[in-house]
A protein has these predicted regions:
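Acidic, proline/glycine-enriched N-terminal capping motif
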Residues: 1-88, 93-95
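Acidic, low-complexity central loop/insert segments
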Residues: 96-182
Length: 182
């Protein structure tokens, strides 16, 4: 049975077109498909990505552990950086694409779309590494498009310029409209 995200009541007021996406109700369209596409390409579009699976991996050597599972060499990432990669099975077949957020060498947040990702990490985790599925505890909005930074800049006192906040990085000290965000 599909779950509602924290943003469902607001979205429900905007659309009656829903689909099950990884166990969560997600709007299939809010206004018009072409209009939404253009907004994302030309201005900005806000999307509920709560359904993406978030997994925290922590303990001594967490980064090295994750590096042995994803296709990208995430060992080269510094704290605050994000890497895009893939998970493959033992035959090299792609299971899922993912992002890996490095908080420290011992604290990693993984984001993918599939429940199998969490189970894979759990199954392969060596002693001392904890794997915690945190999807339900982490509502996830994604603002995408060329005007995204300008729109958010008016809602925070943090510098969100490309120079101060480069692409594929994250910070945990940012508030948007007074709400802490990750």
């Amino acid at each position: 049975m599909s779950k509602e995200t924290a943003f469902h009541p607001r979205l429900q007021a905007m659309t009656d077109q829903w689909m099950d996406l990884f166990g969560y109700w997600a709007p299939s369209v809010v206004t018009d498909t072409l209009e939404e596409y253009r907004a994302c390409r030309e201005t900005a579009a806000l999307m509920d990505f709560t359904m993406l699976r978030k997994v925290d991996i922590a303990g001594p050597g967490a980064l090295a552990f994750v590096n042995g599972i994803v296709t990208r060499d995430v060992s080269k990432l510094d704290p605050g950086q994000i890497g895009y990669g893939a998970l493959c099975d033992e035959n090299g077949k792609m299971i899922d694409d993912c992002t890996v957020m490095v908080r420290s060498a011992d604290d990693i947040r993984f984001c993918g779309a599939n429940d199998r990702d969490f189970h894979l990490f759990q199954e392969l985790a060596p002693p001392g590494i904890t794997v915690s599925e945190i999807t339900d505890a982490t509502p996830h909005l994604c603002l995408q498009g060329p005007l995204s930074r300008a729109m958010l800049q008016g809602l925070t006192n943090q510098d969100l310029s490309n120079a101060a906040f480069p692409y594929y990085t994250f910070r945990e000290d940012v508030e948007i409209a007074g709400i802490p965000v990750f």
